[in-house]
Each structure stands twice: as structure tokens, then as C-alpha cells.
Amino acid sequence: MDDQEPVYKRILLKLSGEALAGNQGFGIDPQVISGIAEEIREVIGLGVQVAVVIGGGNIFRGMAAAAGGMDRAGADYMGMLATIMNSLALQDALEQAGVPTRVQTAIEMREVAEPYIRRRAIRHLEKKRVVIFGGGTGNPYFTTDTAASLRAMEIDADVILKATKVDGVYSADPCKDKNAVKFDNLKYLDVLKKGLKVMDATATSLCMDNDLPIVVFQLSRPGNIKKVVLGEAIGTIVKGE
């Protein structure tokens, strides 16, 4: 497998906050985050440039808090801070694995991380550093999926790798419906029309407008990130006509 050439040169990996929590359901599981760091290290070893966007749902969910009566903008800002906590945790895990890493935040906090500067982010990637984008888009009402699409476009990534709990996109929730059918390939419009759980509509539309493919795959199987980068047919690929 190591003799294979990667099919993508620059990727944006989208991780959910829940992925970092592992089976405990909340917070950050050190073993899980170390495992993710090791997978990213392998991909860097193939010569691939890696950027990461992480959600914050393992610490705080803005939409859930807003549904409970909290001001939506304030709740979303709390969610953005949660993503920065996750970003710092992943940075530490990556650097312990020997991978130089930079965190850039959409909300300035210079004592903690660099502010998001597009050209600087690209320069880090060219120097084989992992760049983690924290703080979402920096604006309330936008999800971290939308932040992933936006940053992928800005850094001219070849693909978004969306890591999930299941092994692709299904017609229904496979955990609840045993008749759910898995899709190997989808078009952006199919995702939007059928309301499939890939990314939210804003994020999907951004990818569609800029013809950026999305690969949805299962994170919990070791080696899957590397398999996607090498072009193996796992998960579901979403692209244009």
C-alpha cells in the first residue's frame, strides 16, 4: 500500500467534536485523540498536506442551548470557543506524535493561537505543517461544516474528508432503520433534494458552487483516512455531474 501514490495532494479533514469524546460521550478521550493524530501522521508521511476543522459538540452545542432559550449568537460563540479547546488538544496530540502543527482561530486570541490568515495557512501547509482551523467561521449562525467548506475553498484543498460514526451516507439512519441503503456516489443536488445527512445545506451548496468533492467515511476504523487519500473506494463520495 505504501507504494501507492495519493490521489489528493491537499486535504481538509472535518472531525466532529463527538469523535474526540469516544465512548464517554463528553469531553476529550486521550486515546481517541492520540489515535487520530497517528492517522494524520501517516497521511503526512505520504506527502499529503493536511488541514483540519473540528466541531465542538463534545463540549458545548450552541443550537441545543439556543433551543433551551439561550440567545443564539451567545450560544454559538460558546460553541466556537469549544472548537478552539478541541483544536489545542489535537495540536498537542499531533506534536507528541512528531507532527509540527499550527492552530489558527477565526476569533483572535493571540496568546493562544495564530489569527486566521489565509496566505500564512497555505505557507504552513507547504512546509508540511498541519493547520487546525478553530473557532468556526467566527460568525454565529454558521456551523463548523460550513467553516470546513469555506476554509477548504480558501486554501484550495482538493477534497473535504468528513469523518463520521458510520461508513458513508445512507438513505436513512442505519442505526435506526435496518432497511437503510448506503450510497457509494452522490451528486450535490441529490444530497440537497433528499435532505441527506452529509453536511448542512449551506456547506453542501458552497461545495457544489465550487465543485469541491466531499468524501464521507467512518473514522473509527484505523487506517481509513490513509485509504481515502490513496483513492480506495470506501465511504461515499459526493461530487458534481
Curated annotation (Swiss-Prot):
Superkingdom is Bacteria
Report residue spans for region: Involved in allosteric activation by GTP. Answer: 22-27
Do the record's keywords include Cytoplasm?
A: yes
What this protein catalyses is: UMP + ATP = UDP + ADP
Question: What cellular component terms from Gene Ontology apply here?
Answer: cytosol
**What subcellular locations does the record give?**
Cytoplasm
Q: What is its EC number?
A: 2.7.4.22
Q: Using the UniProt record, name the top-level EC class of this enzyme in a single word.
A: transferase
Q: Which Gene3D superfamilies match?
A: Acetylglutamate kinase-like
One Pfam match: AA_kinase
Pathway as given in its UniProt record: Pyrimidine metabolism; CTP biosynthesis via de novo pathway; UDP from UMP (UMPK route): step 1/1
Q: What is the similarity comment for this entry?
A: Belongs to the UMP kinase family.
Protein name (Swiss-Prot/TrEMBL): Uridylate kinase
* Native organism: Syntrophotalea carbinolica (strain DSM 2380 / NBRC 103641 / GraBd1) (Pelobacter carbinolicus)
Source organism phylogeny: Bacteria, Pseudomonadati, Thermodesulfobacteriota, Desulfuromonadia, Desulfuromonadales
Gene assigned in the entry: pyrH
